[in-house]
UniProtKB/Swiss-Prot annotation:
<feature type="binding site">
    <location>
        <position position="305"/>
    </location>
    <ligand>
        <name>Mg(2+) 2</name>
    </ligand>
</feature>
<dbReference type="GO" id="GO:0009045">
    <property type="term" value="F:xylose isomerase activity"/>
</dbReference>
<feature type="active site">
    <location>
        <position position="100"/>
    </location>
</feature>
<dbReference type="InterPro" id="IPR001998">
    <property type="entry name" value="Xylose_isomerase"/>
</dbReference>
<comment type="similarity">
    <text>Belongs to the xylose isomerase family.</text>
</comment>
<feature type="binding site">
    <location>
        <position position="228"/>
    </location>
    <ligand>
        <name>Mg(2+) 1</name>
    </ligand>
</feature>
<dbReference type="GO" id="GO:0005737">
    <property type="term" value="C:cytoplasm"/>
</dbReference>
<feature type="binding site">
    <location>
        <position position="267"/>
    </location>
    <ligand>
        <name>Mg(2+) 2</name>
    </ligand>
</feature>
<keyword id="KW-0460">Magnesium</keyword>
<keyword id="KW-0859">Xylose metabolism</keyword>
<dbReference type="Pfam" id="PF01261">
    <property type="entry name" value="AP_endonuc_2"/>
</dbReference>
<comment type="subunit">
    <text>Homotetramer.</text>
</comment>
<keyword id="KW-0413">Isomerase</keyword>
<feature type="binding site">
    <location>
        <position position="264"/>
    </location>
    <ligand>
        <name>Mg(2+) 1</name>
    </ligand>
</feature>
<protein>
    <recommendedName>
        <fullName>Xylose isomerase</fullName>
        <ecNumber>5.3.1.5</ecNumber>
    </recommendedName>
</protein>
<dbReference type="GO" id="GO:0042732">
    <property type="term" value="P:D-xylose metabolic process"/>
</dbReference>
<feature type="binding site">
    <location>
        <position position="264"/>
    </location>
    <ligand>
        <name>Mg(2+) 2</name>
    </ligand>
</feature>
Amino acid sequence: MYFNVEKVVYEGPSSKNLLAYKFYNPEEEIAGKKMRDWFRFAVAYWHTFNSRGEDPFGSATFERPWFKKDPMDTAFAKVDALFEFCEKTGVEYFTFHDRDLAHEGLTLRESNKILDKVVEKIKEYMKSSNVKLLWGTANLFSHPRYAQGAATSPNPLVFSYAASQVKKMLDVTKELGGLGYVLWGGREGYDNLLLTDSALEEKLFARFLEMVVEYKERIGFNGVLMIEPKPKEPTKHQYDFDASTVLYFLKKHNLFEHFKLNIEANHATLAGHTFAHELRVARLNGKLGSIDANRGDLLLGWDTDQFPTDVYETTFAMYEVLENNGLDCGFNFDAKVRRASIDPEDIVYAHVSSMDAFALGLKLAVKLREKVKPMIEERYSEYNSEIGMKILEGKTTLDELSSYVEDLTDVRVKSLKQELLEMVINDVIFGGR
């Protein structure tokens, strides 16, 4: 037993039990769907089972009981820990990079054989468990070979190695029944613009994605392909800067129909956006596929990957998810306990509190939408006028619009009512009305 806790269950808002769900009731129906279907919560293998608590200024602080002397023993023990964790928390999905499951061998062939052994153990567990794979991905950023990029590397052998890793992980994701596959270009970008052939690297990145699409279709993988935007870190400037940048890139290279986005909260703040902003950009373009649920520290300039317990932020996020009628995949907790939180049980506390924060956010977002929709309709109501409809329907010209306003002495705009909106938000969150 790796986690010294009882099974966490829903007990409702009045429960005094800290390790009980107060708001996340997987069977409760909200806005036409069960909570479990709105969320599909997932535990991230890398932060939860791989992290040792290192940071740039200090060594490992986590002595996890699944860390063994032999790397294969560790790999198998991590699988045991995964399924125990999911059983005790009710988390029904997981996500992983290829190198999260097992160490890298001397050759790619050897690495794939090692990976296959761990995948077989996961498949055995899955036969008697409800735990499923949300999405898979390949680690194309940790190994020194990727120091200058993977798909955008100046070395075609590195490009080929990265392509081979993705090929294998598409196979594994399909084999495990994953709902999607994510590509994150942590090393796809530049540190020095003068040393960068930007046109060539853009072409390489597009060609890489074209081959991913071709292979996905050839093997009959029915999951959704997704790109995860991030503006920087580890690269100074990444090509997948934010949702708008990625969507433009996909449009330019005729890849738009093949990909959706996996939006991460902390990546949004690093790009100078709110989490809800990035969700909306993806949603309005029909490209909101999945969410990496976490939060950043606005006073720090790096990816802190904290657990998402801010109910304001979860409410605004769930507003966008409601408007999107859900997600293709789900909510992956790309978050890590703090370096000083050294007990395995801290991982449980973090996930339970975050799942509750999103469940409460969903309930509040339903109420908020009821209050805000009429305010939005009132704000734009003047476009229901004759001239407003002509503008919207493309039935007017600059000449007609000029003649319409040239003799007006005043044009008044209605009050924005932002202060009223802020009152409404607090009334919903704290008053439950």
